[in-house]
């Protein structure tokens, strides 16, 4: 599987935030999920709007799935909507993350364009990415140990 990693793009506004970093902490925590990140928030932000959009198109084009962060949407809604609309136009599935540490509902624009919404949980996120990017169903089961008295 490491020879064929899932290619993903995580929404950004040319700056990393806590949620952006957290996505990769969750993905790396499993130790068995291999991915290639095509997003480049650390790159120099293009000056004009059309150059920004062209740069985002270039970053999204090679990916198999797009991860949308509501925190980035709050910072730059127009930019995130462009990223989501381009992903849809390019036939890329979208996994939207719930708001981290909050019960606040996702913005309607995100819910309407997302193919799947994932909780902030390593297993849920990885399963959603596998389902959307490669149509792989996981066969994991939860096991609960309990003692009878």
Where is each model-derived feature located?
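Short beta-strand/turn micro-motifs composed of small residues
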Residues: 12, 70, 98
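Glycine-rich, charge-decorated loop segments at or immediately adjacent to ligand/cofactor-binding or catalytic sites
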Residues: 101-117
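A short helix->loop->beta-strand "cap" motif at the edges of active sites that frequently abuts
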Residues: 89-97
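Inter-motif core of Ras-like GTPase G domains
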Residues: 64-68
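Conserved TIR/SEFIR loop-to-helix hotspot centered on a Trp-containing motif
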Residues: 72-89
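Conserved N-terminal substructure of TIR/SEFIR domains
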Residues: 1-62, 142-149
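A charged, well-structured terminal subsegment
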Residues: 125-144
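Structural motif corresponding to alpha-helix initiation and N-cap regions
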Residues: 50-53, 81, 122
């Amino acid at each position: 599987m490491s020879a064929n990693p899932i290619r993903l793009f995580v929404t950004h506004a040319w700056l990393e935030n806590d949620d952006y970093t957290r996505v990769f902490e969750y993905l790396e925590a499993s130790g068995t999920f291999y991915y290639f990140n095509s997003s480049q928030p650390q790159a120099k932000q293009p000056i004009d709007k059309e150059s920004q959009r062209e740069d985002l198109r270039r970053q999204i084009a090679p990916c198999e799935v797009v991860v949308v962060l509501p925190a980035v949407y709050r910072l730059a809604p127009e930019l995130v909507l462009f990223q989501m609309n381009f992903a849809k136009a390019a036939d890329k599935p979208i996994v939207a993350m719930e708001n981290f540490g909050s019960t606040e509902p996702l913005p309607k624009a995100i819910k309407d364009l997302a193919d799947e919404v994932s909780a902030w949980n390593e297993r849920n996120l990885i399963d959603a990415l596998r389902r959307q990017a490669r149509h792989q169903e996981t066969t994991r089961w939860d096991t609960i140990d309990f003692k009878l008295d």
